[in-house]
Amino acid sequence: MKWWKKLLVLLVAGVVCGAIMRVMALGVSKNTLSASAAEQTYGDLTYVLHNGNAEITGCAAGVTALEIPAEIDGSPVTAVGDSAFLKQQKLQTVSLPDSVQSIGSQAFSGCIHLQEITVSAGTQSVSNSAFSGCTNLEKAVLGDSVETLGSSVFSGCESLAEVQLSANLQKMGGSVFQNCTALKTVAIPEQVQTLGGSTFSGCSRLYQVTLPAKMTEIQSRAFEDCPKLETITLPESLTTLGYGAFQNCSGLQNISLPEQVTEVGDYAFAHCTALEQAAVSGNVLTLGKNMFCDCRRLAEVTLAEGLTELGNSMFLDCVSLQAVTIPDSVSQIGESTFSGCTDLQHVTLPQNLKQIGGNAFRNCSSLTAVAFPEKLKSIGNEAFSGCSGLQEALLPDTTDTLGYSVFYGCTSLERVWLSDEITELGQTVFRQCKKLPEITLPKNLTTIGESTFFS
């Protein structure tokens, strides 16, 4: 019995000793880690050490001027950390040493009295929102070592009027200069290939931008709401133009898409109310929805051969457009493509056209005649509704589908020819066609909709 008691005591002692040793080991490890990452103070600055390098993490409240040293107690200062000076609202001047290689996210964000910043010659990257919301920042100079700008770096810097970007800059995130309302001119360095989404969105005084020859992509909303931008030369290397890239650029007067462009997003030039000329060339197969909608001064459009489809509402409410020739490669016209083009007098439909979408020419009141191509199969709802100047509609034998209200309100329509392939006339197809004296119904017609001929 005593033998078992002694064995039990020994086992318990072993377990306790092992636990103590593990706790001690963990304690040493934890203390060691804490010591290496502990925040320390140097004057008004706080910093931490990483592998012998110092990272600035903050400063005392109320500081108005900062001179960041190149080294602290022999350790080189290589970084300004994330949120290091976030909302230091009394900070007015900062001096950065060449030893700083990176500036962290939101490092100076919200420093509303900071007026000028020079990013040192050794800095390679400036992270997201580093200077965002610095509303009194007037000038920013980036040293030629800077290769990367994160997103929203200067977003909301509404006093920023002068920017000098690094000659070696390669990548820019989105929204870099969003809502920089004092910015007037910018030259993008030659190595930048992609202009990020919303880069200059809301730059209400921006009138001149130089894009690099090697740029291949302009992403969504890049120049949205830049009303002072009157002209821009797109580089020949450009292949992609994103959603709403120039939307609401109400001062833009002309645009020409380069030969290499293969993709144009929806609303690319929507509401460019001063746009008078547009040339779409190159390898674009499909043009985005609402691409030129509400471009009220657009009078001249050139569409290149190779297009297969015109997007919905592409020229919606382009009230100054008088004539357009659609390339023979186009087989489909989308919904509301020319709806509301009240000055449109002449349109040349492509020989390979098979489908006209609903509302495609709705309320084109100046359109007097349309030559329908021989391959046309269907015409969508209200496609020519409200075309009060249209005098005749001679459909080819291939047309077998008419939507409802196709010619509703065509008050000048006097002559109509319908294909025998049509089996149904939808409701109000010829309603209010008051000058139409007679019509020969298709041989295969089985259904006439409600109010089809009501006048």
Where are these regions (language model features)?
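Sec-dependent N-terminal signal peptides of Gram-positive bacterial secreted proteins and lipoproteins
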Residues: 3-26
